[in-house]
From Swiss-Prot:
GO terms for biological process: neuropeptide signaling pathway. The keyword Disulfide bond does not apply. It is found in: Secreted. Belongs to the AKH/HRTH/RPCH family. Pfam families: Adipokin_hormo. The keyword Ion transport does not apply. Expressed in antennal lobe (AL), corpora cardiaca (CC), corpora allata (CA) and gnathal ganglion (GNG) (at protein level). Expression in CC and CA detected in all animals, expression in GNG in some animals and in AL in few animals (at protein level). This hormone, released from cells in the corpora cardiaca, causes release of diglycerides from the fat body and stimulation of muscles to use these diglycerides as an energy source during energy-demanding processes. The modification Glycine amide is found at G30. This is Adipokinetic prohormone type 1. Disulfide bonds: none annotated. Residues 34-68 form a propeptide. One of its GO terms (cellular component) is extracellular region.
Length: 68
């Protein structure tokens, strides 16, 4: 019985989303669109952080292997 209710609710929600897609039009003009947000860190900083993380994990892995 719960399965039937779930299917009915799912289909109803799906119909609402489908209706929203049908009423959408691309001819509304430009409108207000925000530009792409600037990155908060430089690419070099991100690469350095990832490298340091990998290096730390490699050191932990070596320590664990030495204990075994």
């Amino acid at each position: 019985m719960n399965k039937i209710y779930f299917v009915i609710v799912f289909v109803a929600c799906f119909c609402l989303f489908a209706e929203a897609q049908l009423t959408f039009t691309s001819s509304w003009g430009g409108g207000k669109r925000s530009g792409v947000a600037p990155m908060s860190c430089k690419n070099e900083e991100a690469v350095a952080t990832i490298f340091k993380l990998i290096q730390n994990e490699a050191e932990r892995f070596i320590i664990c292997q030495q204990k075994s």
